[in-house]
A protein has these predicted regions:
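Short glycine-rich substrate-engagement loop in P-loop NTPases that contacts/grips substrate
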Residues: 154-172, 188, 213, 217-253
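Loop/turn-to-beta-strand initiation segments
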Residues: 189, 217-218, 253-256, 285-295
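Walker A/P-loop nucleotide-binding motif
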Residues: 188-204
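Interdomain "pre-motor" coupling segment immediately N-terminal to P-loop NTPase/helicase cores
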Residues: 83-140
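Pre-Walker A (pre-P-loop) alpha-helix and adjacent loop at the N terminus of AAA/AAA+ ATPase modules
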Residues: 138-190
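Conserved alpha-helical scaffold flanking the Walker A/P-loop in AAA+ ATPase domains
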Residues: 177-183, 230, 234-257, 273-284, ...
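Short, charge/polar-rich alpha-helical segments
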Residues: 1-12, 16-42
Length: 335
């Protein structure tokens, strides 16, 4: 998938570069029709460049000095014509979107090797963000994480636990960063976020998504109701489109799948079967690469066993690290 993204973007860059160079040729034609001497100078400069290269190879210092002097005079004459007619010198240069890489996507590093231009890196990130189906990654990331919105009061009688919501969310954050840093390690489990609505489960999921996308991973987010409906539509639609085929492939093969709001879907046997297939395929690494899943839900693990098939509950209990979110609803606190 990462290679496909790069290939698609480089194709876009090639088109941009071609357009910039084609537009330059149009401007040159217009300008040379008005000022024929500019075209003559351009031709003489090209000839001088060829002769200069020949002179360097033949080792003739005098002829090289003469050619250098001639080139400087021609450039000076060209500059004077442009200034006299209020024409910017950039008018005869390609109008690339990125001046740094000239719309190639690559720049030279300190060595002879080429590296990705910052503009292409950003394009890859933007493309990956859009592909993830998460709309607010610019706001929901660890840079925006504020533990102070969580209460620091320890209330075991209320939450049945001897730490505060703030201590809890900080511990969860540390575990999630560990998950990111060890994403390729098959011994690291998937994640189940459980707790009431408005406690930061989706926010933390998006923070993880953001970091993994920056690391070049493919991420796909969807709520459980939409995910399961779409998968069933895909499977039983005789006239499905290529985009529907790609959707199912993405669900099974994306590096990180985020299933939000598990437990809010209307369940039936087909949805249970498809949910098991998705979870099991990704658990067994049947795609020949490491795939991880994050599930967020209002259900605790006991309710998951109760509401879903035994085989789904056992997969989650056995292969997911479970993190309990508790505290006051942050949606009201923010207001």
């Amino acid at each position: 998938m990462a290679n496909e993204i790069l290939i698609n973007l480089l194709s876009e860059y090639e088109q941009k570069r071609y357009k910039a160079e084609r537009d330059l040729e149009k401007r040159k034609t217009e300008l040379y029709n008005k000022f024929p001497r500019l075209q003559e100078i351009e031709s003489e400069l090209n000839s001088a460049a060829i002769n200069k290269a020949k002179s360097i190879l033949s080792g003739g210092p005098k002829s090289l000095d003469d050619l250098t002097s001639k080139v400087n005079k021609l450039k000076k004459e060209k500059e004077q014509i442009l200034i006299k007619n209020n024409i910017s010198k950039d008018f005869l240069e390609p109008n690339y979107e990125c001046k740094l890489c000239k719309d190639t996507g690559y720049i030279q590093s300190g060595t002879s090797a080429s590296i990705l231009c910052p503009c292409l890196k950003q394009k890859i990130l933007d493309f990956s963000y859009n592909k993830s189906n998460i709309s607010n990654l610019n706001k929901e990331n660890f840079e925006c994480f504020n533990p102070n919105i969580f209460s620091d009061k320890i209330e075991p009688e209320k939450y049945n636990i001897n730490i505060s919501p703030r201590q809890n969310i900080l511990a969860i954050k540390d575990k999630c960063i560990d998950f990111i840093n060890n994403f390729e390690n098959p011994d690291y489990h998937n994640l189940l976020f459980t707790g009431n609505t408005g406690l930061g489960k989706t926010f933390i999921s998006n923070c993880i998504a953001n970091e993994l996308i920056k690391n070049g991973k493919n991420v796909f987010y969807q709520t459980a109701p939409v995910l399961l409906e779409s998968v069933i539509d895909n499977k039983f639609n005789k006239y499905k489109t290529s985009s529907q085929d790609n959707f199912y492939k993405t669900v099974l093969e994306t590096d990180l799948l985020i299933i939000d709001d598990l437990g809010t879907e209307c369940l039936n046997s087909m949805k249970l079967s498809e949910l098991f297939t998705i979870l099991n395929t990704r658990l067994l690494n049947l795609n020949n690469h490491i795939t991880k899943t994050i599930i967020s839900t209002n259900l605790n693990i006991n309710n998951i066993f109760k509401n879903y098939e035994e085989r789904i509950g056992s997969r989650i209990a056995g292969f997911y690290d479970i993190y309990y979110f508790f505290g006051d609803d942050l949606r009201f606190r923010k207001k």
